[in-house]
Amino acid sequence: MHEIITLESLCQALADGEIAAAELRERALDTEARLARLNCFIREGDAVSQFGEADHAMKGTPLWGMPVSFKDNICVRGLPLTAGTRGMSGFVSDQDAAIVSQLRALGAVVAGKNNMHELSFGVTSINPHWGTVGNPVAPGYCAGGSSGGSAAAVASGIVPLSVGTDTGGSIRIPAAFCGITGFRPTTGRWSTAGIIPVSHTKDCVGLLTRTAGDAGFLYGLLSGKQQSFPLSRTAPCRIGLPVSMWSDLDGEVERACVNALSLLRKTGFEFIEIDDADIVELNQTLTFTVPLYEFFADLAQSLLSLGWKHGIHHIFAQVDDANVKGIINHHLGEGAIKPAHYLSSLQNGELLKRKMDELFARHNIELLGYPTVPCRVPHLDHADRPEFFSQAIRNTDLASNAMLPSITIPVGPEGRLPVGLSFDALRGRDALLLSRVSAIEQVLGFVRKVLPHTT
């Protein structure tokens, strides 16, 4: 069998019978068993029984037989739903989230539920109950979070794609740390129905894939049209570099990202430095206020709609992560955010969106570009520091607050710690973003050429 380079070509190989869906399933299960130390999945039961099989009645659909995993805050009918927390252990969903239904309709097979940071409230996926997610490409280092199990499952070759959620960077941070692609679409692009929330304002369903091209292919299918983005059809463009996002970088992160820009300049991409001081100040008023105010009511309403009968305090009483427990206790007590403060932050969010529109127009740019995470991937021994959360989301949270589509791609050199480079576009310009960044990744050439489990 020839090398399968892209998700689209893997789909074609399945459709043509070059590889059998059952064989792809067995390879995924074998890889998961061999790499069990990574704790990519939350399995309440054996993996074989929880890994779906291709429905031959669906043959001919675009993703027929394709294994896809889901972060464990996403409802999958008949599978456990834990949101990564001990207090929900044993709860089984009786419904599919909207995104699961969409992917099933396209022929995808549910591979299982991915481990995550407890209740999505962190960026390390160090989970005291379900186990720490390992980093497949940097053993001993943090996999990122909160969609860490999803990123690790893709990076290790267990599955070619996974679905996660992103509130302030929870898809893009682990993607960057694990050396893959993470895509957060324009907020609201895909329904969050059937997902255990953090914040209805900021939460977003997104994709973890090997490449931006794969993300673009999936985006097209989920949008109702099959499309790919060949380099020859995509001209270089003008990209803004926000000053704040390029400041105070780890040396290794800076070198990798600057080197990537240098390669792109040689092929005609234009970069302009942007003073974003007023944007930074406005953005900081939303970062924690909005999600921490919305979390408690959103979680309670979501659990009620899913048939949870024990109340949220049953869950909070069993939280294992000390940082998560501290955040919850503080904001249920003296740190509770006042309604007036929350409403003011929402108004700032509307202003931020207008300012981003103005910034793109004023500088005549199509994209923003910046290092996904300003610090290097931390060793697990040093990752669980309370201050690391703010450091990790420093750059990613702007897209979340301004509701921009955002994508990270790997730019770290082989043999070194992974580094991610992110790009944002204006709201609603997801296809443009994916087209441009698919071209960028082909210029940079930092993509591993073969899906590990398909050769």
Swiss-Prot record:
One of its GO terms (biological process) is auxin biosynthetic process. Keywords: Auxin biosynthesis, Hydrolase, Plasmid. Pathway: Plant hormone metabolism; auxin biosynthesis. One of its GO terms (molecular function) is hydrolase activity. The keyword Nucleotidyltransferase does not apply. The active site is at 71 (charge relay system), 146 (charge relay system), 170 (acyl-ester intermediate). Its EC number is 3.5.1.-. It is an enzyme of class 3 (hydrolase). It holds the Pfam family Amidase. Hydrolyzes indole-3-acetamide (IAM) into indole-3-acetic acid (IAA). Belongs to the amidase family. This is Indoleacetamide hydrolase. It comes from Pseudomonas savastanoi (Pseudomonas syringae pv. savastanoi).
